[in-house]
């Protein structure tokens, strides 16, 4: 025995030295890591609380907390493990063998344990001192408090103590049973050490055999034999689940319990002093990540995510690392401290989230409400002005109440409808804040409303002034006024929408002025003077008014003919007068249409076309905007606009569908109306237009893009101006004659219809293009050369011709034509999408060879849109993205072209087979 005692003393002294040196290492290396990881463990719990599928809904929160290695176990990380000092830590060490790595220090721990059991005094003196040094001095375990915690809870303690420890005990026993096979491994420890440990641990086992059915004995065997074996040591980063187990040993055997407590404290102190390997930490982190639902995450990424979330818990957890809870009242304070933390993050954090989100959304809504309030006030002002106009005219319009409803209500409706929609979208009951965000852009701000209100007043008041002149024209037009009303309302909607979205107030004013000028066609000379004055005021627009008036006039005359044919000429003059006066109210917006259409080539039908020019007006408006942007206003682009534009307008959100369809049909008769001897100057232009239209393929491009820099364009514009002046002169004469002789319009319509069929054939293909994008691609490429020649685009013409030659087959690299000059400006071609595309590139050819499912291609294209929306993206990346997107659009465009050609071939074959 004396030899054994001496050996044990030597071992203890050597182990003390090793422990002291290791303690320093621990403080320097592991303590920092353990403390940081302790914060991260707490953050894991917080993440679990905040996770989408909150674990509390699926698992018992007490079990979840402990099973995550948090509540009591994480305190050990801070270096102040209180509960681990209790005897069942043997079981925990066994449990944790799964997570830790074998180290040579385990032999030291085993020897220390044997020495402890041999002499309680040396064990108590040295190891208690070690424990106090390693662990915080305040950490004195109170056996009286600990002994009551495992399976029964006194009334004075928190009720969560029992479920916490008991559930953890159950989990540990199950896990230890699974690990029992590994417990048989031999460490290479001397039998003496094992015997000594057996003696000391038999005392411990006596108290536990009753409760745990020798599971703890198995655990002890694991811990004992695992000292020098490959069985991994318990991770010092986690405290045992059954930390309070040995308290009940104290009830039965006070001496043995004190020995076991001291022994456990000593063993834990040694474990704590052992430097923690990275593998220990990583395994612990993986375990935590698995329990937190963050599976398959390596320790580094997990630690990063936890450090991100650490801001939540650092303020409250750091000043009191969970080890401090342990210090005197482990039973009560630990459970309650955990419940406090859990309560904060499980309840308060979600509540705070639910509170903060409504606050933010309510702030947003209040912001929208302010806008809505402003817009409503503006609406009221606008409506008041409209009501005044109505009151002035109601006396005249008693006979036409229906028309008043049709016109006045839609006149107001654009504001109301959009505002109501925005209110519904941004109402507090809106589904999400995304809706509110986008509604913010949809809604009209007070500034927009002010602009619209000012424009409304500016438009409507002068209409009254010109009632006399308009009446002169309207008396001669019986049925046209009926068409004017819906068109006027449509124009109001369109103009308002244009203003609301584009905010081009100057353009709207200009067009309204042009409308006034064209409306009063009886006084065309006076109107021209006014136009000249306004054109002087608007220098930027002066360049385009004559051209667009010409183009509009042709369309308006067409519509007038339609109106004459559609409307009954037998209506009484009194009703005509009333309708005239009423139309004057809303003609302000239709005015451009009337003027543009009546003054040009269709002088005979220009006066009736005033009412029906809504769609034409919208088209003219679009063409003007395009002209202002691109600077191109040749005669032929106008003609092209007159034809396909009505159909595009038919699909566009601005125009009335019926009117636009009619204009499609009538636009060519209108354009041929000037074939009368009166309009010889306009005949030449229309012949040109007819030739162009005949040369066009069946499907015309939705948009014709041309360079604004070409000199030929300027020449055409000058010629168009001259011809438009001739038109205006001839149309004035013709307008007067037609105002006197309304019947001529019918004859003109008949002539135009007789002459129209060739052009109508071309136009019938235009609606097909607008309606079916699949058919567009073919005409796009075939029609590109035609437009290039028509518009004489110097830079864009050659590429357009080239693209038009592309065959309806799978593209190859030979089809790609590189520009002659390295940095020449981008050349565009018309596409089936309604907007121009750059020329074919190698990327498109490659995409043909590697086609993806269409849903994948669409998803990639949408993603590229999202990426482009990132303002922080570099310029090069933006260019690459846009190049890819254009290449994809070229791919789709050409495939549509191929499909259309194949479809045409099938139809031809069917036609051939039928006869």
Curated annotation (Swiss-Prot):
One of its GO terms (molecular function) is protein phosphatase inhibitor activity. It holds the Pfam family Zds_C. It is found in: Cytoplasm. Residues 618-627, 642-656 have a biased composition (Basic residues). Its main location: cytoplasm. Residues 74-93, 565-574, 597-609, 668-679 have a biased composition (Low complexity). Residues 243-252, 515-530 have a biased composition (Acidic residues). InterPro entries: Zds1/2 (IPR040206), ZDS1_C (IPR013941). The modification Phosphoserine is found at residue 229. GO terms for biological process: cell wall organization; establishment of cell polarity; heterochromatin formation; mRNA export from nucleus; positive regulation of G2/M transition of mitotic cell cycle; regulation of protein localization. Keywords: Cell wall biogenesis/degradation, Cytoplasm, mRNA transport, Phosphoprotein, Transport. Residues 202-212, 313-327, 464-480, 531-541, 552-562, 711-721, 742-751 have a biased composition (Basic and acidic residues). Signal peptide: none annotated. One of its GO terms (cellular component) is cellular bud tip. It comes from the Eukaryota. Residues 1-28, 69-134, 179-261, 310-330, 412-433, 464-807 are annotated as: Disordered. Residues 115-125, 696-710, 752-793 have a biased composition (Polar residues). 'ZDS' means 'zillion different screens' as both ZDS1 and ZDS2 have been found by a wide variety of genetic screens. Has a role in establishing cell polarity. Together with cAMP-dependent protein kinase regulatory subunit BCY1, provides a negative feedback control on the cell wall integrity-signaling pathway by acting as a negative regulator of MAP kinase SLT2/MPK1. In heat-stressed cells appears to play a role in localizing BCY1 to the cytoplasm. Seems to interact with, and down-regulate, CDC42. Also acts as a suppressor of PKC1. May act as an integration point for distinct signaling pathways helping to maintain a balance among these different pathways. When associated with DBP5, GFD1 and nucleoporins at the cytosolic fibrils of the nuclear pore complex, is required for mRNA export form the nucleus. To yeast ZDS2/MCS1. Interacts with BCY1, DBP5, GFD1 and SKG6. This is Protein ZDS1. The gene is ZDS1.
């Amino acid at each position: 025995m004396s030899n054994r005692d001496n050996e044990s003393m030597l071992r203890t002294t050597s182990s003390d030295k090793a422990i002291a040196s290791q303690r320093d290492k621990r403080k320097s290396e592991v303590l920092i890591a353990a403390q940081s990881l302790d914060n991260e463990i707490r953050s894991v719990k917080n993440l679990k609380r905040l996770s989408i599928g909150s674990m509390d809904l699926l698992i018992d929160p007490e079990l979840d907390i402990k099973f995550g290695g948090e509540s009591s176990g994480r305190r050990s990380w801070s270096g102040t493990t209180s509960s681990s000092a209790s005897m069942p830590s043997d079981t925990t060490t066994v449990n944790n063998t799964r997570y830790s790595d074998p180290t040579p220090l385990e032999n030291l721990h085993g020897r220390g344990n044997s020495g402890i059991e041999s002499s309680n005094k040396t064990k108590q003196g040295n190891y208690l001192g070690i424990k106090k040094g390693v662990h915080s001095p305040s950490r004195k375990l109170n056996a009286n408090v600990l002994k009551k915690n495992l399976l029964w809870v006194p009334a004075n303690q928190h009720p969560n103590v029992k479920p916490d420890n008991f559930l953890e005990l159950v989990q540990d026993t199950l896990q230890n049973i699974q690990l029992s096979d590994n417990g048989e491994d031999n460490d290479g420890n001397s039998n003496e050490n094992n015997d000594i440990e057996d003696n000391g641990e038999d005392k411990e086992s006596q108290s536990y055999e009753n409760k745990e059915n020798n599971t703890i004995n198995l655990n002890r065997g694991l811990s004992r034999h695992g000292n020098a074996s490959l069985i991994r040591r318990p991770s010092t980063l986690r405290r045992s689940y059954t930390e309070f187990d040995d308290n009940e040993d104290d009830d039965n055997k006070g001496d043995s319990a004190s020995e076991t407590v001291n022994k456990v404290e000593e063993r834990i102190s040694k474990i704590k002093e052992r430097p923690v390997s990275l593998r220990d930490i990583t395994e612990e982190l993986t375990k935590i990540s698995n329990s937190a639902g963050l599976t398959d995450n390596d320790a580094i990424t997990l630690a990063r995510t936890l450090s991100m979330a650490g801001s939540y818990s650092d303020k409250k957890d750091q000043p009191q690392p969970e080890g401090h809870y342990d210090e005197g009242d482990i039973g009560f304070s630990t459970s309650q401290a955990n419940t406090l933390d859990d309560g904060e993050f499980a309840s308060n954090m979600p509540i705070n989230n639910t509170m903060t989100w409504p606050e933010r959304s309510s702030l947003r809504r209040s912001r929208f409400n302010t806008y809505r309030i402003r817009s409503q006030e503006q609406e009221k002002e606008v409506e008041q002005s409209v009501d005044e106009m109505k009151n002035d005219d109601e006396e005249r319009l008693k006979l036409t109440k229906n028309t008043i409803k049709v016109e006045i209500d839609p006149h107001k409706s654009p504001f109301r409808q959009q505002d109501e929609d925005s209110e519904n979208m941004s109402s507090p009951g809106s589904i999400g804040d995304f809706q509110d965000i986008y509604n913010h852009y949809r809604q009209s701000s007070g500034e927009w409303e002010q602009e619209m209100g000012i424009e409304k007043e500016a438009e409507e008041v002068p209409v009254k002034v010109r009632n006399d002149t308009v009446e002169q024209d309207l008396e001669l037009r019986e049925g046209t006024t009926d068409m004017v009303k819906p068109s006027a309302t449509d124009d109001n909607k369109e103009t308002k929408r244009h203003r609301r979205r584009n905010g081009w107030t100057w353009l709207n004013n200009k067009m309204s002025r042009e409308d006034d000028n064209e409306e009063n066609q009886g006084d065309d000379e006076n109107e021209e003077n006014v136009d000249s004055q306004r054109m002087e005021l608007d220098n930027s627009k002066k360049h385009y008014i004559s051209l667009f008036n010409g183009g509009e006039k042709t369309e308006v005359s067409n519509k007038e003919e339609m109106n004459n044919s559609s409307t009954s000429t037998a209506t009484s003059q009194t009703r005509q007068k009333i309708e005239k006066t009423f139309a004057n109210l809303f003609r302000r917006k239709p005015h451009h249409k009337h003027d543009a259409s009546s003054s040009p080539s269709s002088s005979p039908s220009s006066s009736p076309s005033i009412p029906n020019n809504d769609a034409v007006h919208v088209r003219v408006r679009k063409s003007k905007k395009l002209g202002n942007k691109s600077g191109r206003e040749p005669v032929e682009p106008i003609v092209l606009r007159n034809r396909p534009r009505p159909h595009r307008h038919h699909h566009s959100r601005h125009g009335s569908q019926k009117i636009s369809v009619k204009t499609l049909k009538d636009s060519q008769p209108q354009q041929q109306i000037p074939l009368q001897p009166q309009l010889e100057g306009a005949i030449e232009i229309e012949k040109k237009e007819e030739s162009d239209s005949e040369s066009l393929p069946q499907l015309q491009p939705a948009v014709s893009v041309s360079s604004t820099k070409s000199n030929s364009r300027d020449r055409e514009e000058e010629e168009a101006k001259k011809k438009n002046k001739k038109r205006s002169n001839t149309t004035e004469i013709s307008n007067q004659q037609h105002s006197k002789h309304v019947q001529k319009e019918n004859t003109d319509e008949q002539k135009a219809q007789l002459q129209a069929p060739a052009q109508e054939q071309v136009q019938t293909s235009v609606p097909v293009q607008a309606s079916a994008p699949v058919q567009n691609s073919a005409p796009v490429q075939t029609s590109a050369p035609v437009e290039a020649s028509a518009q004489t685009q110097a830079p864009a013409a050659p590429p357009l011709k080239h693209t038009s030659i592309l065959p309806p087959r799978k593209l190859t690299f030979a089809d790609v034509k590189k520009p002659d000059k390295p940095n020449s400006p981008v050349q565009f071609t018309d596409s089936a999408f309604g907007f121009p595309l750059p020329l074919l590139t190698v990327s498109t050819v490659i995409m043909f060879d590697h086609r993806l499912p269409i849903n994948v291609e669409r998803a990639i294209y949408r993603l590229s849109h999202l990426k482009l929306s990132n303002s922080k993206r570099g310029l090069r990346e933006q260019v690459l993205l846009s190049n890819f997107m254009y290449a994809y659009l070229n791919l789709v465009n050409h495939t549509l072209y191929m499909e259309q050609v194949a479809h045409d071939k099938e139809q031809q074959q069917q036609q051939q087979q039928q006869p």
